[in-house]
Each structure stands twice: as structure tokens, then as C-alpha cells.
């Protein structure tokens, strides 16, 4: 797996690939992970300043990629998450695909063809190359997209496109239910610093609700929020606490702006909330409209009044929270769990180029028309394959 970050730190890696490592090994694959950044580099890359340390991390990352070249021959597949390097043209992608004839499975779970640079790395933004995404799509053996919007983009350049949703393990990890029989409820938001800005969308509604009701707001993140609200509990995210901290909450929030970048989001916050039986209120944008069923497992909110009224309904009715939460969990088990997606994920590594993976998660969208539906029984697997993950 060619990834950007060290193992066990990035949600897009943990829940899109690392989650399946045991499954791959069980099916005869030898798995190796190669990250661009080491742990020291990861610790500074999203912080302000540290220019010299960031430059050192970039240099080490490129050296690591160069050292891959003599090793690449032993791998049958390369699972590439986003890009070989965060800056520059797709040199490594071209080299490994065109020169070494490697089968690259190209995965992305954001609209990464759109320019996007964090404030902490504005200088590096001058060297980013979002346009390379379409080239990598053209060259890839297979493309794995986190939602239908991303798949439709990739389909412009490559017929071999797979809908591969982000999933959680609902049996071994996300296997507890939130307790809704509490005197004081807690409203949750979880995410990284890059999505913390969206929480401001809910601020006015939450402020009004706090004038009438007594509740806590729990923010699970790697950066403290800056909100003019009372009863905020900031919890620094760790892999060890992500489930237990969320499971102590009763309502989940997923606000987004209505734009192309949000269309590329894969709804992971909702998947986390609902897997734990937490009904959710979200913006009606992108994949949120597929995950949330209005009034069944959550509510949509696109104005201050929507946020206020939807959250208020859930604050006032514990039975409604329980019912919607259980319904949401059932949907996550059926459509967004590790167990439901195992065959779909394994089929990524079919050696038959005509195999394009199925939408195992029933949908009525146009994507069903453009992706051939095949079952895992039709896949051809080479046991004892070496897989660079």
C-alpha cells in the first residue's frame, strides 16, 4: 500500500485499507505498507511553522520513494492512496505503471482533483498538482472511489471503476450502542482539524438551543475548537478513545457547505455515529443524502432553523433517538461494515481486467448503469500474491 501517512493515524487509510489487512492475509496475500511521511514528519506536517522540519520530512519521503524502485518487481499489485508524493508531477506513478508495468489500484475518498491547500502549508501549495489525478486515473489498472460522485469523475478517464465505501468493523470495534436513557444528553462532533471549520454552521442553532435546554457538546478532534458556546467538552482524538468517547453521546452532527469539495466527502462521521446507534443531523449534501434517511435514522438541516428544530426533536424524545439509532446501525451493518464489504474489497485484486466490482450497497443511481455487476465468485485470485499495501 502506497500511502501518505504512517499506519494507525489517518482515517482514510485506517478505514479504507488497514481495516482489511487481516482479510488479505487470510486470503493468501503478503502485505507491505510504504508511507511517504514517517511519524516525525506526520507530527509537524499539519502544524504552523516548522519549515525546516517539513522540508526534511519531504526530502526523506522522496528518498523513501526512490528506494522503492529496486523493490517494486516483487509486487503483483500496488494499492495507491491519493498519490505517491504530495507535491510535484506524477513521476513515480508514470514510472511504475508505464515502465515497470505494475497494476496500480488507485484509491481516493475526496475530490482531490480540486485545488485544496491548508493554511499550515500554504507554501507547499505552490508545488501541489491536482491536475495529475486525471492522468493517474487514465493509467491505473483499477480505480477505487469512496462514493458515487468520485466514481463518476474517474469514469471519464477509465472504465474500470469500483465503488468502495469507507467502512467500520461493526463486530469487533464499533460494536456498542449509545445509551439514550440519560438525564443530560451530549451532542457529538468528531473529525480532524481540516473539517472543524464546518462546525461553525451549527453554532447559531446550538447557541439558541442552549438558552432553552441543558446539554453538553463533545468535540473529538486533533485541534481545539473556537466556538462561543457553553458546556463544550474537547477530547483529543486517539485511536484508543474514538469509540468509547462517541458511544457516550446521543446525537451526532455532520455539517457541510454545499460545494464540489463536499460532494466528494464520503460521510464517515455519519457512518461512525450510526454504527453506534447515534441518530444524526447533517447537511443534505453529497453522500449524506444516501446515508441519512429523513426521519428514519436522522434529519437533514440546511438552515439555522433546520438545525435548531431537528436537534430539538432529538433532545426532547429519547424513544425517537433509540429507534432512529437502531435503524441507523442496521443500515451500517448491511451497507457500511467491514463484513458487508469484504468480497467487494477482495475483488479489487482480481487479475481479470474485465472484472469491475459490484455495487453491493443497493443504489438506484446512474452509476449502476456504468459499472458491470459481478460477484466475488467470478473473481480470479492468485494465492500467495505479494501485495504492496
Language-model-derived ranges and their functions:
Residues 313, 320-335, 341, 347, ...:
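A short, well-ordered alpha-helix in the C-terminal region of glycosyltransferases
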Amino acid at each position: 500500500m502506497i500511502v501518505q501517512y504512517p499506519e494507525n493515524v489517518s482515517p482514510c487509510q485506517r478505514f479504507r485499507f488497514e481495516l482489511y489487512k487481516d482479510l488479505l492475509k487470510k486470503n493468501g496475500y503478503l502485505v507491505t505498507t510504504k508511507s511517504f511521511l514517517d511519524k516525525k514528519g506526520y507530527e509537524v506536517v499539519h502544524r504552523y511553522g516548522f519549515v525546516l522540519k517539513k522540508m526534511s520530512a519531504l526530502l526523506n519521503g522522496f528518498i523513501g520513494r526512490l528506494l522503492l524502485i529496486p523493490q517494486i518487481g516483487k509486487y503483483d499489485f500496488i494499492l495507491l492512496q491519493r498519490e505517491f508524493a504530495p507535491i510535484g508531477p506524477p513521476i513515480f506513478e508514470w514510472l511504475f505503471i508505464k515502465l515497470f508495468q505494475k497494476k496500480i489500484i488507485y484509491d481516493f475518498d475526496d475530490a482531490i482533483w480540486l485545488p485544496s491547500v491548508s493554511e499550515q502549508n500554504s507554501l507547499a501549495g505552490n508545488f501541489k498538482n491536482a491536475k495529475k489525478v486525471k492522468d493517474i486515473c487514465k493509467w491505473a489498472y483499477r480505480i477505487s472511489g469512496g462514493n458515487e460522485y468520485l466514481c463518476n469523475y474517474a469514469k471519464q478517464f477509465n472504465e474500470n471503476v469500483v465503488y468502495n465505501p469507507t467502512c467500520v468493523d461493526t463486530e469487533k470495534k464499533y460494536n456498542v450502542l449509545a445509551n439514550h436513557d440519560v438525564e443530560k444528553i451530549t451532542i457529538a462532533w468528531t473529525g480532524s482539524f481540516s473539517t472543524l471549520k464546518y462546525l461553525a454552521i451549527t453554532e447559531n442553532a446550538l447557541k439558541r438551543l442552549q438558552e432553552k435546554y441543558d446539554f453538553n457538546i463533545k468535540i473529538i478532534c486533533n485541534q481545539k475548537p473556537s466556538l462561543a458556546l457553553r458546556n463544550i467538552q474537547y477530547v483529543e482524538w486517539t485511536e484508543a478513545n474514538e469509540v468509547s468517547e462517541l458511544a457516550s453521546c446521543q446525537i451526532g452532527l455532520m455539517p457541510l457547505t454545499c460545494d464540489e469539495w463536499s460532494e466528494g466527502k464520503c460521510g464517515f462521521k455519519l457512518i461512525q455515529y450510526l454504527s453506534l446507534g447515534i441518530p444524526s443531523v447533517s447537511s443534505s449534501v453529497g453522500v449524506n443524502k444516501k446515508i441519512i434517511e429523513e426521519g428514519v435514522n436522522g434529519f437533514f438541516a440546511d438552515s439555522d432553523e433546520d438545525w435548531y428544530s431537528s436537534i430539538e426533536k432529538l433532545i426532547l424524545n429519547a424513544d425517537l433517538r433509540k429507534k432512529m439509532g437502531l435503524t441507523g446501525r442496521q443500515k451500517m451493518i448491511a451497507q457500511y461494515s467491514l463484513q458487508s464489504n469484504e468480497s467487494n474489497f477482495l475483488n479489487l485484486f482480481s487479475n481479470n481486467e474485465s472484472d469491475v466490482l459490484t455495487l453491493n450497497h443497493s443504489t438506484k443511481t446512474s452509476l449502476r448503469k456504468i459499472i458491470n455487476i459481478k460477484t466475488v465468485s467470478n473473481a480470479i485470485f492468485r494465492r500467495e500474491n505479494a501485495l504492496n499495501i
